[in-house]
Regions:
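Conserved binding/catalytic microenvironments
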Residues: 1-183
Length: 183
């Protein structure tokens, strides 16, 4: 997102000027969000990425290889393909740390993440830490009766500081079962 902040600041500011923020901090958070979205859209352009996703039936590893992106970047981008007239499968995306805290989330589905507390302990995203490098699949049903196909996998990120431990997360990607035939 640093590149977006450095090269697209005028565009970001013009977009932010269209909104009414209650605090300067809220505006700053929104600016980072826009810069992150810009970065993802630059790395994984909408139409080319959407076509590739359909072509390989949304295979996260193949998409990551094809676009030189991480599994997490690919999963997150899939959850944002909701442009009017060119919508992709409505996916949800989640990233959790080893304590079970949701650290990143996005949903184009009816699934709503809890604002407080943890996610269901039976959800496969929690078991992903036990099977490094492997995708876990799960059929899950929410209390409102909606059924989801859920994928989960562990991911690691360098901490950045000298000798700092590697940060481990699990990512989850899912869609309503009615879309499973497209995967």
């Amino acid at each position: 997102h640093q590149l977006a902040l450095a090269t697209q600041n005028d565009l970001l500011e013009a977009t932010l000027d269209l909104a009414r923020f209650s605090t300067p901090e809220a505006r700053d958070i929104a600016k980072i969000g826009l810069a992150n979205y810009f970065a993802g859209a630059s790395l994984l352009p909408y139409r080319a990425f959407q076509e590739a996703a359909k072509e390989c039936r949304h295979d996260l590893e193949r998409l990551a290889d094809r676009f030189g992106a991480s599994i997490e970047q690919v999963a997150h981008r899939l959850s944002t393909l909701q442009r009017p007239g060119a919508k992709g499968i409505p996916f949800f995306f989640v990233r959790v740390d080893q304590a079970g805290t949701i650290t990143k989330r996005h949903s184009a589905t009816r699934l709503q993440f809890a604002r407080f507390g943890g996610a269901c302990p039976l959800w496969n995203v929690h078991a992903a830490f036990e099977t490094p490098g492997k995708f876990l699949r799960q059929l899950a049903e929410t209390p409102d009766g909606v059924r989801y196909l859920c994928l989960a996998r562990d991911v690691s990120k360098p901490a950045g500081a000298w000798r700092a431990p590697v940060r481990r997360y699990a990512i989850g990607l899912g869609c309503e079962v009615q879309h499973a035939a497209e995967l």
